Protein backbone atom coordinates (compact mmCIF):
# COMPACT_ATOMS: atom_id res chain seq x y z
CA UNK A 1 0.00 0.00 0.00
CA UNK A 2 1.36 3.39 -0.95
CA UNK A 3 2.08 5.93 1.72
CA UNK A 4 -0.02 8.99 1.12
CA UNK A 5 1.50 12.21 2.31
CA UNK A 6 -0.84 14.94 3.35
CA UNK A 7 -0.93 17.55 0.63
CA UNK A 8 -0.47 21.17 1.53
CA UNK A 9 -2.70 23.70 -0.10
CA UNK A 10 -1.29 27.18 -0.39
CA UNK A 11 -3.66 30.03 -0.92
CA UNK A 12 -2.14 32.93 -2.80
CA UNK A 13 -2.72 36.38 -1.44
CA UNK A 14 -5.32 38.31 -3.42
CA UNK A 15 -3.64 40.64 -5.87
CA UNK A 16 -4.87 43.54 -7.90
CA UNK A 17 -3.76 44.58 -11.38
CA UNK A 18 -2.97 48.29 -11.31
CA UNK A 19 -1.43 48.45 -14.82
CA UNK A 20 0.95 51.26 -13.95
CA UNK A 21 -1.70 53.64 -12.64
CA UNK A 22 -0.13 54.01 -9.19
CA UNK A 23 3.19 55.87 -8.95
CA UNK A 24 5.59 54.89 -6.18
CA UNK A 25 8.86 56.23 -4.84
CA UNK A 26 11.65 53.83 -3.93
CA UNK A 27 14.93 54.42 -2.15
CA UNK A 28 17.92 52.09 -2.37
CA UNK A 29 20.22 51.32 0.53
CA UNK A 30 22.79 53.76 -0.88
CA UNK A 31 20.23 56.60 -0.81
CA UNK A 32 19.48 56.75 -4.56
CA UNK A 33 15.82 57.42 -5.28
CA UNK A 34 13.64 56.41 -8.22
CA UNK A 35 10.07 56.99 -9.30
CA UNK A 36 8.40 53.80 -10.51
CA UNK A 37 4.90 52.55 -11.34
CA UNK A 38 3.03 49.68 -9.70
CA UNK A 39 1.56 47.09 -12.06
CA UNK A 40 0.43 44.48 -9.54
CA UNK A 41 0.02 44.58 -5.79
CA UNK A 42 -0.72 42.11 -3.02
CA UNK A 43 0.06 42.00 0.70
CA UNK A 44 3.11 39.85 -0.07
CA UNK A 45 4.61 41.95 -2.88
CA UNK A 46 3.98 43.07 -6.41
CA UNK A 47 5.39 44.13 -9.75
CA UNK A 48 7.13 47.42 -10.55
CA UNK A 49 7.75 49.13 -13.88
CA UNK A 50 11.18 50.80 -13.99
CA UNK A 51 13.14 52.64 -16.68
CA UNK A 52 16.31 50.74 -15.71
CA UNK A 53 16.47 47.54 -13.72
CA UNK A 54 17.91 47.31 -10.23
CA UNK A 55 20.03 44.38 -9.10
CA UNK A 56 18.20 41.33 -7.83
CA UNK A 57 18.09 41.03 -4.01
CA UNK A 58 18.49 44.78 -3.55
CA UNK A 59 16.69 46.01 -0.47
CA UNK A 60 14.55 49.10 -0.88
CA UNK A 61 12.21 51.36 1.03
CA UNK A 62 9.09 52.27 -0.88
CA UNK A 63 6.15 54.60 -0.49
CA UNK A 64 2.94 54.96 -2.48
CA UNK A 65 -0.65 56.10 -2.08
CA UNK A 66 -3.22 53.34 -2.35
CA UNK A 67 -6.92 53.72 -1.69
CA UNK A 68 -7.33 55.90 1.39
CA UNK A 69 -3.86 55.24 2.79
CA UNK A 70 -0.19 55.98 2.26
CA UNK A 71 1.92 52.82 2.35
CA UNK A 72 5.52 52.87 3.57
CA UNK A 73 7.26 49.51 3.51
CA UNK A 74 10.57 47.73 3.10
CA UNK A 75 10.94 45.30 0.22
CA UNK A 76 13.40 43.09 -1.61
CA UNK A 77 13.65 43.21 -5.40
CA UNK A 78 13.55 39.97 -7.38
CA UNK A 79 14.83 39.10 -10.88
CA UNK A 80 13.97 41.83 -13.46
CA UNK A 81 12.29 41.12 -16.81
CA UNK A 82 12.39 43.16 -19.99
CA UNK A 83 9.02 44.71 -20.67
CA UNK A 84 7.40 47.34 -22.88
CA UNK A 85 9.39 50.55 -22.50
CA UNK A 86 11.62 49.47 -19.63
CA UNK A 87 11.80 46.68 -17.11
CA UNK A 88 9.26 44.88 -14.97
CA UNK A 89 10.70 43.90 -11.62
CA UNK A 90 8.87 41.84 -9.01
CA UNK A 91 9.36 42.55 -5.33
CA UNK A 92 8.38 41.04 -2.02
CA UNK A 93 7.59 42.99 1.10
CA UNK A 94 9.99 42.40 3.99
CA UNK A 95 8.57 44.80 6.55
CA UNK A 96 5.65 47.11 7.27
CA UNK A 97 4.91 49.70 9.91
CA UNK A 98 2.42 48.84 12.65
CA UNK A 99 -0.99 47.95 11.20
CA UNK A 100 -0.03 48.73 7.60
CA UNK A 101 -0.26 45.13 6.36
CA UNK A 102 -3.79 44.65 7.70
CA UNK A 103 -4.95 47.99 6.31
CA UNK A 104 -3.39 47.20 2.92
CA UNK A 105 -5.18 43.85 2.87
CA UNK A 106 -8.50 45.56 3.62
CA UNK A 107 -7.92 48.17 0.88
CA UNK A 108 -7.02 45.49 -1.70
CA UNK A 109 -10.11 43.45 -0.79
CA UNK A 110 -12.31 46.54 -1.04
CA UNK A 111 -10.93 47.46 -4.44
CA UNK A 112 -11.32 43.88 -5.74
CA UNK A 113 -14.95 43.85 -4.59
CA UNK A 114 -15.59 47.16 -6.36
CA UNK A 115 -14.03 45.81 -9.56
CA UNK A 116 -16.11 42.61 -9.37
CA UNK A 117 -19.31 44.60 -8.84
CA UNK A 118 -18.52 46.88 -11.79
CA UNK A 119 -17.72 43.88 -14.01
CA UNK A 120 -20.96 42.17 -12.99
CA UNK A 121 -22.95 45.31 -13.81
CA UNK A 122 -21.18 45.59 -17.15
CA UNK A 123 -22.03 41.98 -18.04
CA UNK A 124 -25.69 42.54 -17.15
CA UNK A 125 -25.94 45.71 -19.23
CA UNK A 126 -24.16 44.12 -22.21
CA UNK A 127 -26.43 41.08 -22.26
CA UNK A 128 -28.41 40.95 -25.47
CA UNK A 129 -31.99 39.67 -25.49
CA UNK A 130 -32.32 35.91 -25.86
CA UNK A 131 -35.42 36.16 -28.02
CA UNK A 132 -36.65 38.77 -30.45
CA UNK A 133 -39.75 39.52 -28.37
CA UNK A 134 -37.57 40.29 -25.33
CA UNK A 135 -36.19 43.34 -27.13
CA UNK A 136 -39.60 44.80 -28.04
Task: Identify the residue ranges that each predicted region occupies.
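Short, charged beta-turn/beta-strand-edge "cap" motif at the junction between a beta-strand
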Residues: 65-69
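Short structured motifs
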Residues: 6, 58-61, 74-76
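Short solvent-exposed strand/turn elements
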Residues: 17-23, 53-56, 88-108
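Short strand-loop-strand
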Residues: 22-57, 61, 90
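Short, conserved beta-turn/loop elements at beta-strand boundaries and strand-helix junctions
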Residues: 43, 80-85
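N-terminal helix initiation/capping motif
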Residues: 1-41, 105, 109-136
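Short beta-strand-centered aromatic/proline hotspots
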Residues: 36-37, 73-79
Amino acid sequence: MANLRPTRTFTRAPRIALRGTVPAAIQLENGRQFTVRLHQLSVTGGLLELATYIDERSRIMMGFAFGSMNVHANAELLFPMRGGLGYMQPFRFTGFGAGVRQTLEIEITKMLQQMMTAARRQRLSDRSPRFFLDSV
